Amino acid sequence: HFANSIKQYRPLYIGETFSVTCKLGNLIAHDKGQAFEVLSYVAVDGKRIWEDTSIYLYKGKEGIGSVLEWEQLVLQENCIKESWSLYQNLGFEFALASGDFNPIHLHPLTAKVFGFERHIIHGMWGAGKILALLEKRVPQAFEFTVLFKTPIYLPASVIFRHEKTEEGFNFDVVDHTQEKPHLKGYLKVLENS
C-alpha cells in the first residue's frame, strides 16, 4: 500500500443508509514493480458522496501504465513546521483503534520476522493525523491525497511540514534532519461539488 486519494463531496451523517462499491482501477508504472488501483465509492440515495483510490504495489520488475504526477510535490523552504514525537507503543495503540493488527506495527521482534529493522507506525496513522489537523481549514468537499515514501521506525522524532496553496494545502512528514521523506501529499478544496 503506497498511496491513498480520498474525495469527499459531503460528510456521511449518523443514521444515513449508504451503499459501498469497490472495483479494480488502472495499472500504474513504478520502478519497483507493478502498481494498481483499488477504487471504493460510497453513495447515499444513489448519489456519490465519497470516493477512495488506494494504490498498492506488487514488487518485481518495472511496471506498465501511467505515472503518478504528484510524486514530485516539493514544499517551499518557508513552510510551517511542527515536530512530532512518536512513542514506542504507538503502533499497538493504533491497532487497537483501527483493528489492523499487522505484526510489522506492533513490536520490534514481530516486525523483524517480516524484514523490518524495528516496528513501524502505520502510514494511515500519519494520513489520519494530518487530515484531522487540516480538514477543519477547508470546506466539507475536499480531496485528500497522500503518498507513503519510507517507513517511520518507532520510536521516532519527525517533522510535519505544510503550506497553504491557492487550492488548499501541500504537506509532508520528514525525518528530524528534514532530508528523508516519509509521506507527502495535498489537501485541496473541491469546487462546485
PLM ranges: what are they?
Residues 4-5, 22-24, 30, 66-67, ...:
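Mixed-charge, polar/low-complexity N-terminal
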Residues 8, 40, 57-59, 94-99, ...:
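Broad hydrophobic/π-residue packing in well-ordered secondary structure
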